[in-house]
Amino acid sequence: MAQKLWEKSVQVNKDIERFTVGRDREMDLYLAKHDVIGSMAHITMLESIGLLTKEELVQLLAELRNIYASAEKGEFVIEEGVEDVHSQVELMLTRRLGDIGKKIHSGRSRNDQVLLDLKLFTRTQIKEIAEAVEQLFHVLVNQSERYKDILMPGYTHLQIAMPSSFGLWFGAYAESVVDDMLFLQAAFKMCNRNPLGSAAGYGSSFPLDRTMTTRLLGFDSLNYNVVYAQMGRGKMERNVAFALATIAGTISKLAFDACMFNSQNFGFVKLPDDCTTGSSIMPHKKNPDVFELTRAKCNKLQSLPQQIMMIANNLPSGYFRDLQIIKEVFIPAFQELKDCLQMTTYIMNEIKVNEHILDDDKYLLIFSVEEVNRLAREGMPFRDAYKKVGLDIEAGKFSHGKEVHHTHEGSIGNLCNAEISALMQQTVEGFNFCGMEEAEKALLGR
């Protein structure tokens, strides 16, 4: 059985070990590639300050690239009795290279090592989320343009209110995800700062070159203060979780709209048949299960910042084992959101709209404001026009054509989709993922 990195002469109680390790080995498999990348940058820096020879560096880099390849293929495992990914990587190096493998931990603690792994993992996941959101955005904008002339009822208080359009409906969610991307971008910028070299949270007496590892790993800058670098554990995850929750909030609302509009009482849209399921007793049913599950998953994701906050709440500065538990709720959240984005993008691309909703006279009163505005434009004081139309409605005399003439920015007749698309493009460019990708390729020799 492998010796633990921290092991002394005291016998380990197996029940206590099981309790303290928990799901950490399972979660650490997500971090394996990133642990290797971090180690490659660290040992390159160690060689530059004389703690490794050039020959040792060459051997270590070659073996680390082999380990990375196994992780990339899904073949990397954390062996029984090995408590985390850091221990497994060091064990593999030591088995293959002997004492050289034992040198890679110089100037490093598992505290800054796991923080680095999490940041490398998280920024990669943020990139994938951003790409998925951008795909959804393009579908929404395209559908907004496609159906820009198709009117639908707008609601307030779930009461029919004013004319809207499918152009506005699709476009509203398109602009919403642009704002969501701003939160994601802010989270990325906070994440993309290098904690390596903070060690256990108080630095090292080794002359570490933290600027070098920052460059090698493609970070924007450092977490300069070593105490803050460790204090950022939990805070970084919470900030990212808030960005994920913001995106999830938009998708949840969209899913609710679509489920409601798909029901027979509304009949505004028709969801793809392959995204609905039947009933075991009612042969006519087509239940919007995919969007119902999407809504539930997104609502769960919206609780994630609170979960992380409660785990890290009331901790003083320094490292505490409490922080390990955050991984269990944080790491799986990315795939859950990506799944929801994939389903939503597919459904919104395939959804069919009812182009004749307003043929039903029950929607006639949504044009009451149009009539008030017409009278006001002709010179009648607005309040008098409002009263007249109200009396006509009460007397059953109200009538109005089923057309609208809105021209101001963001209205039915002027959706501003080009301007919204420009905002999205500007936001996407603001991430600047190129630096991290090029840095990791350079370390891997690709």
Where are these regions (language model features)?
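Charged/polar positions within long, soluble alpha-helices
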Residues: 44, 48, 69-76, 94, ...
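Acidic, glycine-rich loop-and-beta core segments that form the ion-binding/anion-interacting portion
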Residues: 217-305
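Glycine-rich cofactor/substrate-binding loops
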Residues: 2-38, 99-100, 267, 282-446
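A short structural micro-motif
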Residues: 62-70, 231-234, 391-396
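Alpha-helix capping and helix-loop boundary segments enriched in small/acidic/polar residues
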Residues: 105, 110-113, 157-164, 168, ...
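A general structural motif at alpha-helix termini
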Residues: 60-61, 217, 262, 273-275, ...
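Short amphipathic alpha-helical segments with heptad-repeat character
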Residues: 119, 123-130, 134, 141, ...
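A helix-coil-helix interface module used to build multimeric assemblies
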Residues: 2-203, 208-214, 221, 277-278, ...
